Amino acid sequence: MSSKVLKIGQITDIHIGEDENLVQGIDVRKNFLTALNSESMKDIDLLVLSGDLANENAEPGAYRYIAEQLKGVKCPVCIIPGNHDSLDVMVKFFDMPVKNGKCYFRYDLEGRSMFFLDSAIGEVSRDQLDWLEEEVPKVDGEVILFMHHPPCFCGHKFMDLHYHLRNMVEVQQVLSKFKNLKHVFCGHYHSEHQMKFSHIHVHAAPP
């Protein structure tokens, strides 16, 4: 396992619209560019876009705009869909691996292994969990997991009640088996949360 410290940038829930019009009064394109070009994104080893790239209806113009901005990013980029995205549309603009109609994959960088899950429909499919159970034990060293929905409640009453991961218990049962999985990074809640279940720390990033 590499001793190099990886610097990973995560951008989530940018909700880009079809055109330059404001989204609910917010200049989301400007916000995206501000995040993309921020000081914290300098010299990163990997950029992760963790879902809800489009605003409401998987607008092609949103993905086209994002893809154009990503051309200037010098590091690798990993993308997973959120509940407002459409994988069928996204793959027309981004290099995203698709298996069984979902976007889930392992990405190795500098001796580190990162796993990415597709929770766009509000749950993690059984085939993804079976794949994790097969692949994670093969890794000698710590692994990192990215997904759109947090795999636990976050203390946000509205989101926890209405928009939580539907098969959360099933997902937790699988993830808890992996002693080399200590950190999960996600989005979806539009606010920052630090939670923990079992031995796993969950980091929900704000937009």
Regions found by a protein language model. Give the residues of each.
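Short, flexible loop segments at the rims of nucleotide/cofactor-binding pockets, characterized by
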Residues: V23-V28, A54-A58, F93-D95, A120-G122, ...
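Extended active-site neighborhood of metal-dependent phosphoesterases/phosphodiesterases
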Residues: G61-K138, H164-N180, M195-S198, P206
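His/acidic metal-ligating clusters that form di-metal
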Residues: A35-L47, V124-H203
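Short low-complexity stretches enriched in small and charged residues
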Residues: M1-I8, F32-E39, E68-V77, N100-Y104, ...
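Active-site environment of divalent metal-dependent phosphoester hydrolases
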Residues: I16-E20, N55-P60, N83-M90, G122-V124, ...
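Active-site-proximal beta-strand elements of phosphoester/diester hydrolases
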Residues: V5-E18, G111-I121, I144-F146, I200-P206
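Structural beta-sheet core signal
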Residues: Q10, L49, I79-G82, L145, ...
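N-terminal active-site segment of His-dependent metallophosphoesterases
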Residues: M1-Y65, K138, C154
